[in-house]
Amino acid sequence: FLFGTAPNAWLCAHAGAWQPGQRVLCVADGEGRNSVWLASRGLDVEAFDISDVGVAKARALAAEQGVSVNFAVSDCDAYAWTPGAYDGVAAIFVQFADPAMRARLFANLIRCLKPGGTLVLQGYTPKQLDYRTGGPPHVSHLYTQPMLREAFAELDIVELREYEAELAEGSGHCGHSALVGLVARRR
């Protein structure tokens, strides 16, 4: 598992925003570490990723953990974003998108939340290019607080902060990292 099987720490710290039985979407969920963990907490989880290999590994992880997740193979543009369908959306390190695709993706994250629904998002900041411990090599794919504040202006920002931390998320995210985390609620 490129990013390990344990859930992301930012997600763990903020998953209390969702209660058992609520519907949560995990965007670009890779090999399933976050969706499987959320399902183990009693959430009704849907997840998608562009990689059929990643989704196959996610399905195997869910079976191993004895949980049910509705997985789909899709890219972000082709995914069937249902307006107002989710109590929560988890977007953890969804940083493969250039600025135009990112704008479409962020609009869909907002649109698919129910009123009162919560978005939990984490990504790398441009300072991450100094550390090279994970993430994309393109500054245009990285996040800043002002970018996120502007992109999610129609949501109520619960928490938005840039910080540094040691990540140990498989070989894909390993070492000192420059991060930004967002928790926001749809009005």
Describe every region a protein language model picked out.
Residues 4-22:
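Conserved alpha-helix/loop element of class I SAM-dependent methyltransferases that forms part
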Residues 79-88:
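A short acidic, Gly/Pro-enriched loop at the edge of an enzyme's catalytic core
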Residues 140-161:
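Short alpha-helix
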